[in-house]
Amino acid sequence: MHQFEEELTCSICYSLFEDPRVLPCSHTFCRSCLEGVIQLSSNFSIWRPLRVPLKCPNCRSIVEIPASGTESLPINFALKAIIEKYRQEDHSDVATCSEHYRQPLNVYCLLDKKLVCGHCLTIGKHNGHPIDDLHSAYLKEKESSGKILEQLTDKHWSDVCLLIEKLKEQKAQCESIVQDDKKVVVQYFKKLSETLEHKKQVLLAALDEINRQILEEYEPHIEKLKKIREEQLELMSLNTSIQKEESPLVFLEKVDNVHQRIKALKEKELPDVKPVEVYPRVGHLLKDVWSKTEIGQINKILTPKIKLVPKRKLHSKNSEKERGKPEELLQAANPLSVTFIFTVIIAIAVLSFHKPISSVVIESIPTHISDFFGFLYQDFCTCMQNTVDVVCHKLNSLAEFLGGIVPF
């Protein structure tokens, strides 16, 4: 607090003097503060004298206050004038209370550890709290600054530093793990994408090849029939022109020529068109095999050899509906094919165990036998898948039945 401001502060309320009155001992106090002291003293007195004795709060000397009270005490006009002038001046360097207008913060509250004004102590929320003057509080806190430094440099803060380093290390480890996992994910899906792209190109190449075979199969027949059709149209046009011929000799010669050409044209052998189909169907393969294969096993799926084969006859008109029934699918399985394939697999396994089969032997197998095995393999896979579906369906039905009887 400014030294000049301290001289203008009441020692009872620690605020700027309000209506300053002078005691006989020459000490000045606020009139309201003196009335409070007199009221407190009169509460302990059993009689009311003509003059009220009062102990000065500063010098502790006994002074007498007239019976009329503090109103009869002289006003310190000089001090009052100085205070009024002081209040009119700008004191931006002096801290003032935020709750009490223009009251300086000139007292230190020991309970709340903060600066307060005189009104805070008398009528505010700090009333009755232990206090100290600013200079004394400053000296005490200055002496305890060493303890503050000790509190800020004890083992607790070393533990905080160690914990920070430990957390940073754990954070770095976790981030490293995440980065490694990211690399694994990228590599995994890159490899998976390459595998799928390779399988895609292989299947598309196989379909392009079968498309070429389709052209070779049908295009010659179509061209041959087109020529026959063109010759037919030519003969029809020739016949129309002959009908306009008026010379009997010329007409007969031309008609005979037309008959011979028609006979020769009709005697030409027409191509024997047998219904064929593409087998196996890639769409069915993707649906029945690929969609049920684990991702990691896709690279192990064999690419089928797509061919044009004679179209198989349907056993009934509702064969497509019957294929959807698990029981009839199971009955449709060819026991002879399954037995034959199992026998071949066992024989190959025995021969491989006894003596590895050389690549020369494998390559010496005729092409038609290899195709036959491929055809049987596709049928076998389809039959086995149908069998598994039926078994799973039966097991699920049994589990639902038992679940309704015996609670799990």
From Swiss-Prot:
Keywords: Coiled coil, Endoplasmic reticulum, Membrane, Metal-binding, Transmembrane, Transmembrane helix, Zinc, Zinc-finger. It is found in: Endoplasmic reticulum membrane. The keyword Endoplasmic reticulum applies. It is a single-pass membrane protein. PROSITE patterns: ZF_BBOX, ZF_RING_1, ZF_RING_2. GO terms for biological process: innate immune response; negative regulation of canonical NF-kappaB signal transduction. A zinc finger (RING-type) spans 10-60. The keyword Endoplasmic reticulum applies. InterPro entries: Znf-RING_euk, Znf_B-box, Znf_RING, Znf_RING/FYVE/PHD, Znf_RING_CS. Zn(2+) binds at residues 97, 100, 120, 126. Belongs to the TRIM/RBCC family. May serve as a multifunctional regulator for innate immune signaling pathways. Interacts with ECSIT. This is Tripartite motif-containing protein 59.
